Structure formats: structure tokens, C-alpha cells
A protein has these predicted regions:
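A structural boundary/capping signal
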Residues: 18-194
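N-terminal signal peptide c-region/cleavage motif recognized by signal peptidases
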Residues: 13-15
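Bacterial N-terminal signal peptides that target proteins for export
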Residues: 1-8
Length: 194
């Protein structure tokens, strides 16, 4: 009896994990990052394509991961062509470069936290291949991560931008009172992300 109860518990747990919801946020009128997000909006507005192949995504992530990490500007991402030419950038720069290279009009540029305990903001890309959402973080990873497989306390989105909108994610409900007061840069000088 106990082995079948254990088997049933494992089956239920795996089904719950398989049904994990990806936080795509709700439409936001404004964010604390609005004064700094112009390069992101310009790049996203220029995207015309649709979902590239997974092989192309993996190749781009590997290329972006090979760019040297250097924190330059705390809030504003470098234009993708600057990051490509220098082969250097922080998480914002690499994420925006990746958005541009993907040329997928449905991609999302995300600002959030790597984990609940982090104080420094991080940037990455959310991408849908037509079947599911993926976390693309070429600052820290060589390969895409299925968004529904990310641990509950990791890759916590706060705000995201797409060609068609700006989104606030559930963790920001506690941040709304201080929305105009944030001084947290996206990436931090001296904190090297391998």
C-alpha cells in the first residue's frame, strides 16, 4: 500500500510541476525604469520576425555568453550594435543584444531578480518557441531554460517589455509603494556574473 501511495504522490507532484504557470505579468502604465528604457523600446519596436529555430537560439546564447561581462551603465542598456561590436556587456546589454538577434516580435526583455534573496536586479529574455516559454539568459547560461522548470525562487520577473506592451509581474505588488524611489541598478559594478 505504501509504495502505491508514494507512486501516486510522485505522479501528482509531477503533474503539478508540468502545469506550472509562467508569470507573463499584467499590463503596466509605467515602471520605475521608464526613464532608462528607451533603447529597449526602440529595439523591440524594430523586431519583425517570428520564432527562430531552437538551434539558432542555442547558437546565439552561446555567442552572447562568450561576450565578456562588464558593467558600464547602471540603468540604460547599450544599443545591440554596440554590444556586438565590443563583445562586452552586462546583463541588460546582453539581453537586449539577444532580443535584437532573435528578431522575434513576441520576445520579452525582463528586469527582475535572480533569486528572492538578491538585491541586485538582473535582466534576461523570455521567449516563446510556439509551444512554451523559455528563459534566455546568456549572461549566466549557454542554453535556454524551460520557464515552467525554473525553481520557484529563481528568475523572478519584476517588469517586462515586448513590442506591444509593458508588463508588471506579481512580485512588484510589494514594490508599488516605492516605484518612483528605486535606486537599484540593473547589474552592479564589482559584482561579476560569470
Amino acid at each position: 500500500m505504501k509504495p502505491s501511495l508514494l507512486s501516486l504522490s510522485l505522479l501528482v507532484a509531477s503533474q503539478i510541476t508540468a502545469l506550472a504557470v509562467v508569470d507573463l505579468g499584467t499590463t503596466a502604465g509605467q515602471t520605475p525604469y521608464d526613464p532608462y528604457i528607451q533603447p529597449v523600446k526602440q529595439t523591440l519596436n524594430s523586431l519583425q520576425g517570428s520564432a527562430p529555430s531552437m538551434e539558432k537560439v542555442k547558437a546565439l546564447m552561446s555567442k552572447g555568453r562568450s561576450f565578456r561581462y562588464a558593467h558600464t551603465e547602471p540603468y540604460t542598456a547599450a544599443r545591440p550594435e554596440v554590444t556586438a561590436a565590443r563583445k562586452v556587456g552586462d546583463c541588460k546589454d546582453k539581453a537586449l543584444w539577444l532580443c535584437d538577434e532573435l528578431d522575434d516580435k513576441n520576445v520579452r526583455f525582463v528586469i527582475g531578480k535572480m533569486s528572492r534573496s538578491e538585491h541586485v536586479r538582473h535582466a534576461w529574455v523570455m521567449w516563446n518557441d510556439g509551444a512554451q516559454w523559455w528563459v534566455l539568459d546568456c549572461t549566466l547560461n549557454f542554453r535556454p531554460i524551460p520557464a515552467d522548470k525554473v525553481a520557484a525562487g529563481d528568475y523572478i520577473p519584476l517588469y517586462s517589455w515586448s513590442k506591444t506592451g509593458t508588463y508588471r509581474h506579481s512580485p512588484t505588488s510589494n514594490l508599488l509603494a516605492t516605484a518612483g524611489k528605486t535606486k537599484e541598478p540593473v547589474a552592479a559594478k564589482g559584482k561579476r556574473r560569470s
